[in-house]
Amino acid sequence: MLAIRSSNYLRCIPSLCTKTQISQFSSVLISFSRQISHLRLSSCHRAMSSSRPSAFDALMSNARAAAKKKTPQTTNLSRSPNKRKIGETQDANLGKTIVSEGTLPKTEDLLEPVSDSANPRSDTSSIAEDSKTGAKKAKTLSKTDEMKSKIGLLKKKPNDFDPEKMSCWEKGERVPFLFVALAFDLISNESGRIVITDILCNMLRTVIATTPEDLVATVYLSANEIAPAHEGVELGIGESTIIKAISEAFGRTEDHVKKQNTELGDLGLVAKGSRSTQTMMFKPEPLTVVKVFDTFRQIAKESGKDSNEKKKNRMKALLVATTDCEPLYLTRLLQAKLRLGFSGQTVLAALGQAAVYNEEHSKPPPNTKSPLEEAAKIVKQVFTVLPVYDIIVPALLSGGVWNLPKTCNFTLGVPIGPMLAKPTKGVAEILNKFQDIVFTCEYKYDGERAQIHFMEDGTFEIYSRNAERNTGKYPDVALALSRLKKPSVKSFILDCEVVAFDREKKKILPFQILSTRARKNVNVNDIKVGVCIFAFDMLYLNGQQLIQENLKIRREKLYESFEEDPGYFQFATAVTSNDIDEIQKFLDASVDVGCEGLIIKTLDSDATYEPAKRSNNWLKLKKDYMDSIGDSVDLVPIAAFHGRGKRTGVYGAFLLACYDVDKEEFQSICKIGTGFSDAMLDERSSSLRSQVIATPKQYYRVGDSLNPDVWFEPTEVWEVKAADLTISPVHRAATGIVDPDKGISLRFPRLLRVREDKKPEEATSSEQIADLYQAQKHNHPSNEVKGDDD
């Protein structure tokens, strides 16, 4: 048997007809190829040797005639007259395109042998399959159009929303990634938190109603995560690798993609634009949420030789299959920069609300005033003690939101967010806030917060305040605790501070010394900077969680479980007193031994451990900040101004920003040019020069009157001290929280140090800035800056 090569048909199409005829012509040719494949070889030979036209010649002739009737023979004005398709010439007399000789494929090139084992289909079955294929494509097309036309329904108030009217896929079918991408696109045009939460809630409800098994993947992608933070799973792809994937997927050069990225400042927009200008003959299967999520996890697992190439190819396969706005949001997800004005907390709130509408298990507790608000609160609270979507989401679906606290508990081996303290400016303020309440004061150590889990199998896991796994960084800590825990202790979770310590001089060393230690795979024999563990809380002991117990009980459990060894493991130095003079002396003593100040905690009233919360039941008092704003702040340099005079050649001042967690944006708060030694200024200028970008990020909020000379990628975190905070018409920090139209700025900011232990998104939040402003003793309307601050 012989069959027509479809690829050879298609190669001849461009030389036979204009671009508008291609779709008509190609479908005819595919049908012709199947019909001719059933002709016997002998019949073909007779037809070719006969003086009459062959079957192929007749079919081609008919196709040309049909194409001429459907499309007028006019000059193609849609492309440049200087550009010609391959195999075309320009007739000078007629001024129209004609097919040059030799461009048609030879008959033998159009025929290829078919395996004898293949059973030829009848013409009827061939035509029937063509119809099915066409119907499937039409159905896919209509499903996409239907989804785009319906996506606006997600903006309805949840009470008025019907998931069945929104879904464009059958129950049990995988959720299309386009659905999530279109929902993201809808959110991108909104700024109100309530509207954004409603859209997310309705999106999640639609997934629950159709394909609940896809909910975990949908929640992870919405939160722009691929795994729990403590697992340390990251995509591990740089911008250059993503650029390569985009260029190869969409037929662009890397230089072209880089140029567009510089112009647009958003690789997602570059990917979307590249896809929109690319035509494809054969469309891959549409992406699903699960396909994207599973591929992300596969990318994260790639390691070793050629891992970057493998990651790039996986990304490319996803990009090739994208359509509409999918390239934009797929690329941003790959960059872990979704930037849609909502955070993981918003996703949790939406998840809780979606569960209420899907609730089939139980009714809300009696006297629940607002089930939606209560459900959102429950999911957020559960996430603080068990931050694992893979556990929470199935529990939510099977047991309901009201039972979630019973089914999802604090678990050994899964770190919780640390309880944090609010700043205060003096001992008198402490006594005023803690009237008639027993409280204790502890030294505030200048080290690295650590949450240490000791498993029942005898292994340790050490986590940072951000749930990063630091076990390999502190092997000496694990050895010390193994030696000093009492035999009765089989498992525990310890909250403590790991501090650099000189054992010969019996002296606490500054944080800067601690930061010189290697961060991964540390060998005990190579350690040059020793550390001491200062323990102040016990959250779990021998299978029993203690976070609901008051501090007095937790601390007793701590003291009973370990032996102290000075320089290796010590309990935080503490005193319980409400005498103002005694507390002042204790504060001075803490500073003398190298501590930052004091942490003041309620002892037996309102004294439970509140995970991931900056609580009024813990206060911090820093000696250096009693005459300023009460605390230092951690800010991100997002731009700079060229230096003049003796600072020529370096940056003379930097524009700093705080971070708004809910809006996912950096908001300008001050310019800083003081606190730098010449060496530090050179170092910071050199470091940030490699982070210069052409235009500010879309998620930077800066006043119109500020015109920096250069903009930076948000990469560094600087600890800054200031005299006070003021309302500012120039800066955008906390706009809308204290003043509806104006932001907050720092007066007389001074750089203290670079915080290498923090990511930009972990900088001081706009909400914290507002809290500091409101806590100022002299807070009055005249405390306002009319112009720019230096």
Swiss-Prot record:
Chain residues that bind Mg(2+) 2: 596
EC number: 6.5.1.1
Motif, Nuclear localization signal 1: chain positions: 68-75
Gene Ontology cellular-component terms listed: mitochondrion; nucleolus; nucleus
Keyword Nucleus: yes
Motif placement: Nuclear localization signal 2: 505-512
Binding residues annotated for ATP, in chain numbering: 442, 449, 465, 601, 614, 620
GO biological process assignments: cell division; DNA biosynthetic process; DNA recombination; DNA replication; double-strand break repair; single strand break repair
Regions of compositional bias (Basic and acidic residues) in chain numbering: 781-790
Reported phenotype of the disruption mutant: Lethal.
Keyword DNA repair part of the UniProt annotation: yes
Cofactor(s) demanded: Mg(2+)
Signal peptide location: none
Stated name of the protein: DNA ligase 1
Gene name in the database record: LIG1
